[in-house]
Structures are given as structure tokens and as C-alpha cells.
Design a protein with these regions (language model features):
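Electron-transfer interface patches adjacent to heme c in soluble/periplasmic c-type cytochromes
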Residues: 1-9, 22-32, 40-86, 94-98, ...
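Short, intrinsically disordered, charge-biased short linear motifs at domain edges
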Residues: 12-22, 114-123
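Alpha-helix N-cap/N′ positions at the starts of helices
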Residues: 11, 109-112, 196
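Solvent-exposed, charged amphipathic helical/linker segments at domain boundaries
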Residues: 99-116
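Basic- and aromatic-lined ligand-binding clefts that recognize polyanionic substrates
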Residues: 91-95, 114
Length: 221
């Protein structure tokens, strides 16, 4: 992000401060449990996600966790890909900007999830019989152009700027929406945004950003 002051996503994330402090039907807000504001209390949290959450028996990204944790604690629904979920996700992630990504890749649940995420990455699907790997690994389509679109290299890491502002869409997208958008040209049905398959795929991709600083929200075409 060459000029974060010229990123509409930053303004959108900052507006989430209101949601952070607003009490839900249960009479509590995020701020009631996380004192000091999001910038202080959430510092270093986002770089550990996606991760396996034992309480829920699955891998979760920040967006997944908010979907369940928000209603449980505040009584306020925060559905994944909803505006408030996305804004709060950006707010939480911005608190860790500059902190190196450090997702777990060594525990037994993480290793199992990474194996499943890798299988999804290499699985051929849809009318075109393509896999994610066909476009996003350096020995295949990565670092080339397809239909005017540059195909990024997953093994070089491209998750640490999500959610990102899409100038072509005039909107912020999280990683799940990017996954769903990618499935359209493959001629296959997209999964629901909160699917475990997407969460494990996101973990698999995020491991390639381990050690690199978080930079949210990104800005891309």
C-alpha cells in the first residue's frame, strides 16, 4: 500500500470504531471485554489467524470467529461477508499492521488442516477442470497474464493485505469473496463464505506469508 491515506478501505475500517463500542442486545460491546480500544487490545491477534479453534472444532479466520463470537458475547449478529463483519475484521487486522504473520503450522490440528487446504488448492473442479494451482503456482500460470489479469504466485504469499479495497469494484473484499470470485471463471459453484474448505484453503495460503508484516487494508484493482 504505497499511500494508505488514499485508501478508502482505511476510512471504512475506522468507521468500525462505532460498531466496536456499540452495545448489542446482550448489553455488551466489543469494548467492554477488550479494554484500551481495538488498536491496543487487538495488537498481535490477527497475525495468528486463520487457526484451529478447539472450542469450535474447526479452522477459523477472523471473519469466521466474529460470526460466532459476536452473537455469543454481544447478541449482535455478525454474518460473514456482512458489512459490519468486514469492517470489524479490517479494524482488528489494522491493529496488527507491521506485525509478522505467524499462523500455526506445527500442531496436529494445523497440520491436518494444511493437508486438506493443500488438497483443495490442487483439486480440479468445474467445467474447465482447473485447480487453484493451475493459475497460482510458478511452474504453471503464476506471474503471467490471463485475459488482462495478472495471476499472483500463491507460494510468494498474497494473503496479508486482505481485506483489500478493490478499485474495480469500489468496495472492500475479504479473502472469501476473492475465492468465490475466482470460482466463477472456473465454471463451478462457489461454496458458502463460512465453509470449512475455504477456511482451510485460507490457512494453507497464509502459511506462505509467515514472517512477513501484515498490511491491511490493501488496495488492488
Amino acid at each position: 500500500n504505497l499511500d494508505p491515506t488514499n485508501n478508502p478501505g482505511v476510512l471504512r475500517a475506522e468507521s468500525a470504531e462505532t460498531a466496536w463500542s456499540r452495545k448489542g442486545p446482550a448489553g455488551k460491546s466489543c469494548a467492554d471485554c477488550h479494554a484500551g480500544g481495538a488498536a491496543r487490545s487487538m495488537r498481535g491477534v490477527a497475525v495468528r489467524y486463520p487457526r484451529h479453534v478447539a472450542q469450535y472444532h474447526r479452522v477459523m479466520a477472523i471473519e469466521d470467529y466474529l460470526t460466532i463470537h459476536g452473537p455469543e458475547t454481544t447478541g449482535r449478529p455478525l454474518p460473514i461477508e456482512g458489512a459490519e463483519n468486514l469492517d470489524l475484521t479490517m479494524l482488528v487486522k489494522m491493529a496488527s499492521d507491521g506485525v509478522p504473520v505467524a499462523v500455526d503450522t506445527t500442531s496436529a490440528p494445523a497440520r491436518a488442516a494444511l493437508a486438506r487446504g493443500k488438497a483443495t488448492f490442487h483439486k480440479r473442479v468445474g467445467e474447465r477442470n482447473h485447480a487453484c494451482a493451475d493459475c497460482h503456482t510458478p511452474d504453471k500460470g503464476a506471474n503471467k497474464f490471463l485475459g488482462g489479469r495478472f495471476l499472483g504466485d500463491a507460494t510468494a504469499g498474497f494473503t496479508r493485505h486482505f481485506p483489500t479495497w478493490r478499485t474495480s469494484q469500489n468496495d472492500a473484499w475479504d479473502m472469501r469473496k476473492r475465492f468465490q470470485w475466482c470460482m466463477t471463471p472456473l465454471g463451478t459453484n462457489m461454496l458458502s463464505a463460512d465453509s470449512i474448505e475455504y477456511a482451510e484453503l485460507e490457512l494453507y495460503l497464509t502459511q506462505f506469508d509467515n514472517g512477513k508484516p501484515l498490511n491491511v487494508p490493501g488496495i488492488r484493482h
